[in-house]
Design a protein with these regions (language model features):
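Acidic, Ser/Thr/Pro
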Residues: 1-108
Length: 108
């Protein structure tokens, strides 16, 4: 069976171990109008953002400081590779566990 990938959105797991002061990220391609939903918990508060790049510019529609958990969604305003990113505290390694999923524009 061939397909265009327009099946029901599936949860993708987040399972990261991030060294003290370092970053970890999970990236995915989104089309304009796609909605990315995520849910995570971290072993300690960490800085978290959702970002993408336009040339050399980093665009951060979501930028949260010192969060240990988050559940939210964001609809992409442009087609691009988008990344969920966590920054571990300078003095502490962390683990981040959770999931993400993409709902295509129009719910497909």
């Amino acid at each position: 069976l061939g397909g265009s990938g327009n099946t029901a959105a599936k949860d993708q797991s987040i399972d990261l171990k991030i060294a003290a002061g370092k970053v970890g990220e999970v990236c995915m391609p989104l089309r304009a109008g796609d909605t990315l939903a995520w849910n995570f918990s971290a072993s300690a508060p960490a800085d978290f953002n959702l970002h993408h790049h336009i040339g050399k510019e980093v665009v951060l529609p979501i930028d949260r400081q010192a969060v240990a958990a988050d559940r939210a969604r964001h609809t992409a305003d442009r087609a691009n590779d988008w990344c969920l990113m966590w920054t571990a505290p300078a003095a502490q390694a962390i683990t981040v566990k959770g999931s993400w999923r993409v709902a295509a524009k129009g719910g497909k």
